[in-house]
Amino acid sequence: MREKRRRFLKFLGLVAGGFTVFGGFKLFKDDIFKQKISPSKALSQSIANGVIRVQSQRSNVFLYASQHVQDMEDAVIKAANAATDFGWLKTGQSVFIKSVNNSGFPYPATSNPIAISAMVKLLKLKGAQRVIVGDMSGIQHLKFYKDKTIGSSRELMKKSGMLQAVEAAGGEPFFFEEGGWDSFYKDHTDTKGFWDNGLMMPEILKKVDHIVLMPRCSRHVLAGASLGLKAVVGYWRTDTKLQYHYHAKSLHERTAEGNRAKTLLAKQRLVISTGDKLLATFGPDKGYVHTPSIGLVIAAESIVAHDMVSLAWLLYNRTLLPAEEQGTFIDTSTAVAKLGNTLAVKWLGTFGNSLMSEKLLKNDLKRIWDDKVLNHAYRIFGGIPDIHLENIQNTVPEKMLKTLREMVHYQ
């Protein structure tokens, strides 16, 4: 309770500062003037107009339920083996595991070290010569500029416990900022949209043969949720991140389109995450940690299909939170999101950038169809996946499976 009070008082200080610096009414007005059309209604209209369709070919998402932390390594291996036959991996090739290392806080604020370790071992067993695990931490914890770097993704990964797990499993830790500003290249998406000028991505991606994405299941104060699609931001150099946050009105769409980067389309093979712990409120670094009675491992070749199920799992578990953790101001307020994004622009760029930047408009997430990142992903990834949930060894209770099916089936 004392820690919770301390965090709240710290937040009030940030709000007060933001209110003073950025202008009170302008900062808070989105709490008064609501969106003219909800994301779910906009999605319905796009489907009715033929802009978005439900895919005819089904997308398999593999679920393995585990009740004990000590079983998680085995659960990850079984889920991965069910989701792919690893036919894409040839002996002697290299694999990059994209973790989520946005801060130094432990799982579920960052990727599950047990899961990362399991995947490193499995890929080695399947013939990979090198398994590289990496990310670049968020702007609140790492200031990476052309002429200086303040902070360290390596030290943050060590603090979270992930670094030790990677090294013990035989993986190679890798941190994008350590190569310097010029160790990034310009990649392009395959869709004409918000990234026509390209994205600055780390050179390591051009050198590896394959990519496995291992996100976590978390709330995100700005984007709504931090799942697989949102993890793409960790690749980007600071100047790309500045564009992302500066043009806040399209932040959700830019998130989705970032996953159409040509390197990712060519090399990403699998998305796998664990949901035995969820950062169920606020996010991406802090919030209420919820531990379900049964934890899910979610694996799929399709990042969109993975995120649909992962978001359903997050939303389902948010209904089970203690009453005092549901509907809190800091978790649901559009003003908090607006201020948070404005501060991110200031950290990434300048005070002037923050004054001129677009204001983020956050919406509530009640159903997966309320998520603007996913809704745009349906448009650019060929439609809404027809999700088929594969219950590995019947470990997922039928009632839970039925609930998830209903949540991800578009009607």
Residue ranges and their predicted role:
Residues 2-411:
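N-terminal and secondary-structure boundary signal
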